[in-house]
């Protein structure tokens, strides 16, 4: 979800159905990229500073942005670009929805 040019929320949910549970390489790739981004946001202090929140529930990931920060936007754009690159090869297994606030 975006407000003008800034990312305000990212949701990653569901299962790619590329392979059986536990052996799905598409899910593993998406999870690895998303986990790396979440760890980066935490290490850079954005969670502690309450500029964003990460909600992990039932295998789903949601990142909510409360206060805009240019560095955080670069990190989040990295996630979006990585997910978009997955869709180039696995478009039948990954759906990206873009919303404007």
What does each model-identified segment do?
Residues 1-25, 35, 39-101:
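N-terminal intrinsically disordered, cationic/polar leader segments
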Residues 32:
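Phosphate-binding glycine-rich loops of NTP-binding sites
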């Amino acid at each position: 979800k975006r407000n003008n040019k800034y990312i305000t929320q990212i949701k990653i949910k569901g299962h790619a159905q590329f392979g059986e549970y536990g052996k799905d390489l598409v899910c593993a790739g998406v999870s690895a990229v998303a986990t790396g981004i979440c760890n980066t946001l935490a290490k850079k202090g954005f969670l502690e500073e309450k500029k964003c929140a990460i909600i992990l529930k039932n295998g789903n990931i949601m990142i909510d942005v409360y206060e805009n920060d240019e560095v955080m936007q670069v990190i989040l754009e990295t996630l979006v670009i990585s997910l978009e690159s997955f869709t180039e090869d696995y478009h039948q297994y990954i759906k990206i929805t873009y919303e404007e606030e």
